[in-house]
Amino acid sequence: MSSPDDFETAPAEYVDALDPSMVVVDSGSAAVTAPSDSAAEVKANQNEENTGATAAETSEKVDQTEVEKKDDDDTTEVGVTTTTPSIADTAATANIASTSGASVTEPTTDDTAADEKKEQVSGPPLSNMKFYLNRDADAHDSLNDIDQLARLIRANGGEVLDSKPRESKENVFIVSPYNHTNLPTVTPTYIKACCQSNSLLNMENYLVPYDNFREVVDSRLQEESHSNGVDNSNSNSDNKDSIRPKTEIISTNTNGATEDSTSEKVMVDAEQQARLQEQAQLLRQHVSSTASITSGGHNDLVQIEQPQKDTSNNNNSNVNDEDNDLLTQDNNPQTADEGNASFQAQRSMISRGALPSHNKASFTDEEDEFILDVVRKNPTRRTTHTLYDEISHYVPNHTGNSIRHRFRVYLSKRLEYVYEVDKFGKLVRDDDGNLIKTKVLPPSIKRKFSADEDYTLAIAVKKQFYRDLFQIDPDTGRSLITDEDTPTAIARRNMTMDPNHVPGSEPNFAAYRTQSRRGPIAREFFKHFAEEHAAHTENAWRDRFRKFLLAYGIDDYISYYEAEKAQNREPEPMKNLTNRPKRPGVPTPGNYNSAAKRARNYSSQRNVQPTANAASANAAAAAAAAASNSYAIPENELLDEDTMNFISSLKNDLSNISNSLPFEYPHEIAEAIRSDFSNEDIYDNIDPDTISFPPKIATTDLFLPLFFHFGSTRQFMDKLHEVISGDYEPSQAEKLVQDLCDETGIRKNFSTSILTCLSGDLMVFPRYFLNMFKDNVNPPPNVPGIWTHDDDESLKSNDQEQIRKLVKKHGTGRMEMRKRFFEKDLL
C-alpha cells in the first residue's frame, strides 16, 4: 500500500492507525493501569469474569468503579476490570488454577511471536499465492504495467494464472482496479506494496468490492447477529436472577471459569489490537448517524441492524447490549480473544459493509481537496488509472474509477495550479525547501498525437514502402542489395520487392506515391520508430498507423500537411476516423446480426419495402420461417455428399489465404489491374432489379437462410458492397469470410472458393454474383478477373496460344497475380 509520503500529503483521517498510541480511547471511563508484574493476574481475573458472568459485562463503567470500591471494602483481591490497549497487548497468556491455591504460570510468548514473524518474512512474500491479471483495456495504463506485475508476482514466489478462476479458492485472487466477477479481487498496488516491503501484507485495504457487496455483507452479518442473539437470550434466561456485582460472580463461579480458561486462550498481540482500533476508528467516521442501538446507552458505537426477535427473556436492557455491539467500548481483552478468529475473517467485509455503497456515496469537501492536492503533486500521472487507485486507499468510501471520474468531470476545473516536477515526475523545491506552484501543466504520460507526429509517421511509412518495393534507400538513392545479404534477407526482399522492377527505372522518392498500398510492414519498424520518437509507445504508433493513417490515406495526409504549411496555416492531426458507422434499423441487444432476430423483424421489413414478385416473397417467407425454427432444413440438403466433397476438394484454407496477403498487390501490378478493371464496365453494369430473387442457382449448399431474407437482388448487392468496402488488412481474410457469412449469408466455404477464383481481388467480388445470378452458372465463364478451372489448366500448360488468350481475357496484371497463387500452392 502506498504511504502518504508518496503523495507528500494526506489528512490525518486518511492515515492508517498503525501506532497504538494513535488509537482514540473513549474518555467515558478512565483507564486504570496495573503494575507490570501483575499482568498475568490481571489477565486471569478478566478471563474469570468473562467466563463466569457473560451477561454482566455490559454494565456501565460507573458500576465497575462501584464494584471495585466494594471489593476494597470487603478486602477481596480483584484484578482490574478495565485496561488500556497497551496493557491488553502486553498481558501474557495465563493458565489459571483453582482457587484452592494453585500457582499462576506465565509462559513467555514474546520469543515465540518473534520467531513466527521471522519465519513469515524469510520466505518469498507471495509464496503459495496465485493471481489472475485482468488484461482488459481499461484495467491498466499499458501492457507494460501488466507484464511488470506478472514479473513481480513470479519473482516473489507467486503464480500467474492463464485463465480466470470460476469460483473462489484459497490463496487465489484476481488483480484488477474493479471487481465485476464476484471473486476475491485486489488492486495492483497490493502486489507492488508486498514486493516493496518483502512481506505478505494484510489485503483488507486492497480488496475491491463487488457491485452487490453491501447486500451480501448485510445478509451475512445479520445471520451472525441473529445467532449471537439466540445465545444471548439463553444466557439471559439462565442468569436473570444472578445479576450481581462482579466480585460475587467471580467468587461463586471460579471453578467453571478455570476449566474454560485452561482450554481456550488466544494471545492478542499489539499489532492485531492496533488494527482492531483502526477499524473501529474508520467505522466511527463513516457510520450513518441513523444507526439504531437497542440500549441507547452507547451511542458512539457502530451497530449492525438486527432482525426482530423475541425479547421476552431479556429482563435487563444492559444485558442485551452485550451481543449487539460490534466493538465494545471498554475493549475487554477476553471478548477480543473469543471473537478474534471470526472477526479477523470478516473484518474487511465489516469495515466496507458498514460504509455507504460506492454508487451512492457523495464526495465531501475534504475528500475533494485531498484529491486535488494529490493530483497537483503528481501532475504527469493525472490521466492514469493507477494514481486514482492509490488515492482510493486513503478515501475508502470510493473506488479508483469513481475518484478518477470525479476529478475529470468536476475537480479538473478547480485545479488552478500544479507543483513543478522534473522529467522523472519528481517534485521540485526552491531554495527554502518549498514546493513551486505553476499554472503550466507538464505533459502527461498519455499524450495526444500532434499533426507533426502524424506527418513524421506518414513520411517514415512511405520511406519503408519505397525501400521494400525498389530496394533503394530513399535518402541516399543507393541500392540496398549487396552480395553479403543473408538468405533470410534475400527471402524477405523477394516477398516485398516488385518482381517487374527494372533497376534504374524507379521514380524518385518525392514523386513516389503509395497509392492504396497498405503493407506489409513489420513490427520491427514500429519498435525502432518508437525508440527514435519516445513520446508514444510501440503499440501506440502501430495503432496510429492502422486506425488513422491508413484510413486517412498516407499520400493524402502528406499532401494536406505540406499544403497547410505552405499557406502558413497550422495543420490538424488526424481524428474522428475510428467511429464505427451507424447501422441501419433499430439495434437489438446481443448478436443483432443473427438470422433468428432478422426473421422476427422480417414482416415489418416487408411492409416497408415490397418484393419484386410473389415468388421471391414466398421464398423469403419460407426462409424466415425456417430460420425461426432453428434452420429446420433437411440435414441431407444442408450437408449432402456433393457439398462435403466440394469442401474437401478445396486445397486452400483460410489460414493459407490469411498468410498469403490475398488482398495485397505490388504497386505496378495493382496499377495494371485497375487499368483493366476500368475498361470492363460491361460486366459490372448489370441492373440488379432485372434479376429475380432468390435466383434459381442460389441453393442452400452455397447460402445460409439469412441470404433469403433479403427482399431483392439489389438489397443483397448493397449489403455485399458495404461488407467488402470495410477496412480489412491483408491478414484479415478469415475476418472477411466471417463477416460475409454473418452479414450476407454466404457460406464460408463458398466465399473462400470465390476468393480463390478472384486471386483475392475484392473489386471483382460483386461482378461474380451479378454474372452468376444473371447466367445461372457458377463460376461465371468468360468474365475477366474470374478464373475457371479451364483457365488454370491453360496457365499451367505454358501453351503460348493459350497464354495469349488468357492475357486477352484477364490482362497481364491478373496473370502475374495468378502465377503467384500457383507459386504459393494456393490452388
Curated annotation (Swiss-Prot):
The modification Phosphoserine is found at residue 731. One of its GO terms (molecular function) is telomeric G-quadruplex DNA binding. Residues 121-208 form the BRCT domain. Residues 58-72, 238-247 have a biased composition (Basic and acidic residues). Residues 227-237, 310-319 have a biased composition (Low complexity). Its main location: nucleus. It comes from the Eukaryota. It is found in: Nucleus; Chromosome, Telomere. Interacts (via C-terminus) with RIF1. Interacts (via C-terminus) with SIR3. Interacts (via C-terminus) with SIR4. Interacts with a GCR1 homodimer. Essential regulatory protein in yeast whose DNA-binding sites are found at three types of chromosomal elements: promoters, silencers, and telomeres. RAP1 is also involved in the regulation of telomere structure, where its binding sites are found within the terminal poly[C(1-3)A] sequences. The opposite regulatory functions of RAP1 are not intrinsic to its binding sites but, instead, result from interactions with different factors at promoters and silencers. RAP1 mediates repression of the HM loci and telomeres by recruiting the SIR complex. Present with 4390 molecules/cell in log phase SD medium. This is DNA-binding protein RAP1. It comes from Saccharomyces cerevisiae (strain ATCC 204508 / S288c) (Baker's yeast). The gene is RAP1.
